[in-house]
Amino acid sequence: MKKATFRKIIWANLILAVLILPKIIFYPYSLAPAELAKAMLLYDQLQPLDDTFVTIMLLLILIGYLVSLFLLYRFNDYGRQLYLVVNFIALFTYFSQGYVVFDSLEYVLDGISTIFIGFIIAIIYFSNLSKEFKKKK
């Protein structure tokens, strides 16, 4: 794989994340059926506010994700390690959340995002570009 292609994949992953965040934050159940959306909004209102630890972890994951993408774009070995750690921590923080309901658009975007994450991990560890990360600059 060429470096330019890998960099385009990094950009596509970043653009997808920028598209997903506003959808999840501001329009969480916009495409869900009316009864389900109403029930989930009521469920969300009954839940206590996220504790400080979870909020800090989510912010650290977001910052770590952006930094790791930048370092991967520059073919830095620390970016490769950080990307793996951030995605591993994000996986476990998803389990700390209660019920999660996806509408069809969120489901598709999350699936594409997961494919990108797996594809990037495969490229940075198992392709011929993995040697580029090990070079000292």
Where on the chain are the PLM-derived regions?
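Topology signature of small-to-medium multi-pass alpha-helical membrane proteins
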Residues: 1-137
